Every structure is written in structure tokens, then in C-alpha cells.
Amino acid sequence: MKKPLRQQNRQIISYVPRTEPAPPEHAIKMDSFRDVWMLRGKYVAFVLMGESFLRSPAFTVPESAQRWANQIRQEGEVTE
């Protein structure tokens, strides 16, 4: 008899983007990406939704941050 997988109905924790009025002043805009800024050595995406920005988690690669931004944008188009 096989053992059941532990924590079968464990909730998936999803990242809830922080809402900010604007990217912080000490963030450096990455010219080659639409939504990516460099913040404390990490790459963060800021996506303008309505009147505020949604902030991504910190990524080590700028492409990942841009991919996150594109995904958020697509989800935003679906809900509106």
C-alpha cells in the first residue's frame, strides 16, 4: 500500500503585488526593458494599473521581472 502524499490540500501561497504610488527615486530604470527597474542590486518590475503601480518580487535577472510584468498586464486585461 502506497503512502498518501503529505499535505495534499495545502494552500498554494501566491505573491500579492504591493501597490505603490510610483517607483522609488533611488530605483534605476533599465532602458532595454519596459517595466524593469534596478533596486538594491535586484531587478523589480513596476506595472502601472489604474492610478498606482504594482511592484513585483525582486528577481536576479531582468528578463524574469519583465516576464512577471507581462503576465500581470495580461491578467489585468482579462479582469477589466
UniProtKB/Swiss-Prot annotation:
Keywords in alphabetical order? Cell cycle, Cell division, DNA-binding
Q: Which GO terms describe its molecular function?
A: double-stranded DNA binding
Fetch the InterPro entries from UniProt: CedA-like_sf (IPR038463), Cell_div_activator_CedA (IPR019666)
Q: Which domain of life is it from?
A: Bacteria
Q: Does the keyword Lyase apply?
A: no
Q: Which Pfam families match?
A: CedA
What biological-process terms (Gene Ontology) are attached? Answer: cell division; regulation of cell division
Please verify whether the record's keywords include Protein biosynthesis: no
Quote the function comment for this protein. Activates the cell division inhibited by chromosomal DNA over-replication.
User: Please, what other remarks does the record include?
Assistant: In vitro, binds double-stranded DNA, but not single-stranded DNA.
Q: What family does this chain come from, according to its entry?
A: Belongs to the CedA family.
Q: Which HAMAP family match?
A: CedA
| Quaternary structure annotation from Swiss-Prot or TrEMBL | In pull-down experiments interacts with aceE, dnaK, glmS, lpp, rplB, rplC, rpoB, ybcJ, zwf.
| Protein name per Swiss-Prot or TrEMBL | Cell division activator CedA
Q: Which organism is it from?
A: Escherichia coli (strain K12)
Q: What lineage is this protein's organism placed in?
A: Bacteria, Pseudomonadati, Pseudomonadota, Gammaproteobacteria, Enterobacterales
